[in-house]
Amino acid sequence: ANYPSTDPNNHQNYSADDYRNRVLSDKTEPGSTMKPFTMLLALDKGVISATDDELIDVTERVGKILPDNKYFEMTIQLILEKSHNLGTIVVSERLENEDFYNSWNKLGFGKSLGLMPSIENPGQLRHYSKWGLSDKRSLSFGHGPMTTNLAQLARAYLIFANDGALPSLKLIKNTYDDQMQQVFTPESTQRIAEILDSVTSMKGSGYRAVIDGYEVAGKTGTAEMVIDGKYSKDGAKRTYFVGFSPVINPKYIMAVRLDYPKKCFVSWDPTLRNRCEGSNSAAMAFQKAMERILINDPEIQSKLES
């Protein structure tokens, strides 16, 4: 779905850009919505355990990312709950460039979905042989040598509904996909899904996506707008939330992207008044849209009543 919408009966009131399908045609940096995949790769490769007693040291500077002096050691769950860049980068340093590239390639990034080829922009995934020193670090939290469209990002999250395997996207309901590619192990996928459940708790950055009475898991993301090939100088943001429900065997996955969000929810802190992030914009849009879907799904409702 795209908004603002257009009225074909009054096409003279719109420009060609108004008719653009932004879900397929816009290539963007997905920001922190990619952090779960970094942790999945690390868990599969055995460089983390993602247990409650495993602690990641976040006291040392890595590249341009400085310690925030708020945390000294963090669990993987806390890193994802707080969307902590340095913690994610520390984990990424344990991984090989080739493994990153291969996993992101299997997730479909940089490749056409084949849904509507005439309008789709598949983005890019630069080959690891052309990466600089900072590219792996940037890639670990959704920046650097990759761009993607929103449909590709939503598709990547389908692994949480398919035990780590990636199906193709379909426009026709109930068509069977017998060529799913296994990207991550079922065990690792289930563990990270459990952690994403905590991201939408009151402790996590996605708590505004919580829907009372329903299971929801997901991840926030924020990226600076790229205008004419350069990051915006006026602080323009693009915010994301990608989530799914229920947490175990999800039936619905939704990806939300907001461009130039201007009115973002803030609480008591006046310094955050103009600070738009996935947590206080896209997560709220997700909450409203997903809630309407869940309360109108007879199957979901019958399970709640049983």
Q: Predicted segment positions?
A:
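A hydrophobic, small-residue-rich beta->alpha segment in the mid-to-C-terminal subdomain
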Residues: 261, 271-273
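Short, gly/Ser/Thr-rich active-site loops of penicillin-recognizing serine hydrolases
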Residues: 180, 273-306
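Beta-lactam-recognizing serine transpeptidase/beta-lactamase-like catalytic domain environment
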Residues: 1-32, 37-265, 278
